[in-house]
Amino acid sequence: MTIPCALPRSLQGYRYHPAPSASSRPVRGRLAPSPPGYMHLGNAWAFLLAWLAVRSAGGTLVLRMEDIDPQRSRPEYARALVEDLRWLGLDWDEGPAVDGAIPDEGDMAEQGPCGPYFQSARAALYDATLDAMDRAGLVYPCYCTRKELRQLAGAPHVDDAGAPYPGTCRHLSPEERRQREARGRRACLRLRCPEGRFHFQDGLLGEQSFTLEDCGGDFALRRSDGVVAYQLAVALDDALMGITQVVRGRDILTSTPRQLALLRLWGFEPPAYAHIPLLLDGQGERLAKRHQSLGVRELRRQGVAAAEIVGVLARLAGLRPDMRPLAAADLLADFRLERLPRQDVCLRDLPCVPDWLRPLCLPC
């Protein structure tokens, strides 16, 4: 299989699973946890709905560990995530520990044609792709610090993945770049974003249309510390793994036009996207790592059954009229992605809050 467009010649022998057309079945979906911590209920919510979307369509499910940041990811978190997914009744066909064997130490065995399935083992692939894009003039070095970006863009929160960027370094001359490097400035790599609108049909939210300017302008593909950015790693892995369906939280909605831009530059067919509502605590805030006291691992330790968690999540998603315990597989027969709520879901909406969930259910 020839890798198209800007991807480097060295990748042409890389294992590439071509995505079928949108009308082809079965679908290929993915679970893509990142291991900077243990799984919380918000993660479980997203993984359950993504799993149901693939399995209800008779599709193939890939588990990909998004551990690209070495400073935040730890092997014990990756093993715990796999254990918790299994405990919740979620399985997969490709990736680590397909057979359920999770060693206490060392690497988990992988199964499938598109590995490696840990992003940390795919760094050479990302670097080769960036080198090819650099040679093609698609990227440029940016020497701006976060402080400078805040001052330039008036943005209170700036990060490498999606800060509003005014294009300060886009047209620097070679001499201006040398001057910055001589002062010890380290550069990230940014995409020269194409103009125009990116349209896509979201499986839950309907027709979507963005310009990349709407999403912050030229975005980083590699951070100044050398770590590849989320947008590049995810888009490239989805393409090379033949992913045709991506179900994820609506907080990542504006990542989609960025990933569509990359896929278009590389010549890949994009997957179908569906952005699901977020799960909120009783104060109306998104469940996140600060809620680890009520993470899946802690709930297991307290004796809460997986079926109880699935039952509550099913009720919140509108998949069941009550919260009776049940297995994830029990939801498959009647699951329809388009029936999920469009608005974020608050735990306080439950008609009767289980005791184990009460700490998260202060009034919104």
Description of each model-found segment:
Residues D93-G95, P270-Y273, L319-L326:
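Short, surface-exposed acidic
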Residues C114-D131, H157-D160, R185-E195, L316-D330:
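Short secondary-structure transition/capping segments
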